[in-house]
């Protein structure tokens, strides 16, 4: 085996998130609510040398299959990521992330007076105001949000 090869166990069934920008893998896990609490085997490789990028992160989650809306939510955190669905050790489906028109349940609004931060139990929804940047706007209070400073829910 060559020194440059990465040794990571193959998964039989589940999801592989590849080409995550280096150092962002833990943010991806947090945004998707993947914490291992359900007993699934999770493999995380951070800052792996990559030919396409200088470094990338890889996440493998056994027995969990991301839905399309989960895949598209990754566009803010990991715009160049690919999501591979694995069945019986084989690639069954490959998806590229794409920024949706709205993003719900990932971020909390940064406005402390927003109804989503009250005792009302209302989930936050961010509308994509601009794909450049990108720029998000809270659906409830219209605050423009800086993606890099937002808290995950």
From Swiss-Prot:
Its cofactor is Zn(2+). Binds 1 zinc ion per subunit. One of its GO terms (cellular component) is aspartate carbamoyltransferase complex. GO terms for biological process: 'de novo' pyrimidine nucleobase biosynthetic process; pyrimidine nucleotide biosynthetic process. Involved in allosteric regulation of aspartate carbamoyltransferase. HAMAP family: Asp_carb_tr_reg. Contains catalytic and regulatory chains. This is Aspartate carbamoyltransferase regulatory chain.
